């Protein structure tokens, strides 16, 4: 995605191009929706975006970086919406990655935002703590 930047030392940084909004907590709702359909969480399609919607986008971004392809690449926006709302969440291939990383992505891509971990909880997940993929 256009908002991922890689430094000369290989560090990946996320940018928001000034589109971010500050919310009080992870249950706060956004008043407007802006985003790319390939990264939109189920609740975004139902106009209920929240901070946990970004956790979904993180999971999709990790799959894209790890497998060098977005799981929704080549699909029209309407088909992506149907996939996100009605089909199982995408997953990271377990053949090339640790079970911790596969599990981390799975936690990011829980369909129900109320059940999805928030960023603070994700920081406690094994792969983040051990830094081993």
Each model region followed by its residue ranges:
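Terminal C-lobe "cap" of eukaryotic-type protein kinase domains
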Residues: 110-132
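Conserved C-terminal C-lobe helix
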Residues: 96-109
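Structural helix C-cap motif within protein kinase domains
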Residues: 67-70
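Conserved activation segment of eukaryotic-like protein kinases, specifically the C-terminal portion
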Residues: 31-40
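Short proline-rich PxxP-based motifs
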Residues: 84-95
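Conserved catalytic-loop aspartate of Hanks-type protein kinases
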Residues: 54
């Amino acid at each position: 995605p256009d908002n991922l930047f890689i430094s000369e030392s290989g560090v990946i940084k996320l940018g928001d191009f000034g589109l971010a909004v500050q919310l009080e907590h992870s249950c706060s709702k956004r008043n407007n929706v802006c985003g790319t359909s390939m990264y939109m969480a189920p609740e975004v399609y139902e106009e209920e975006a929240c901070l946990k919607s970004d956790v979904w986008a993180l999971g999709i971004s990790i799959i894209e970086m790890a497998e060098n392809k977005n799981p929704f690449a080549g699909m029209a926006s309407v088909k992506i919406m149907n996939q996100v709302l009605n089909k199982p969440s995408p997953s990271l291939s377990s053949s090339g990655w640790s079970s911790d990383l596969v599990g981390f992505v799975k936690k990011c891509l829980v369909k129900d935002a109320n059940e999805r971990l928030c960023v603070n909880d994700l920081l406690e997940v094994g792969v983040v703590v051990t830094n081993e993929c």
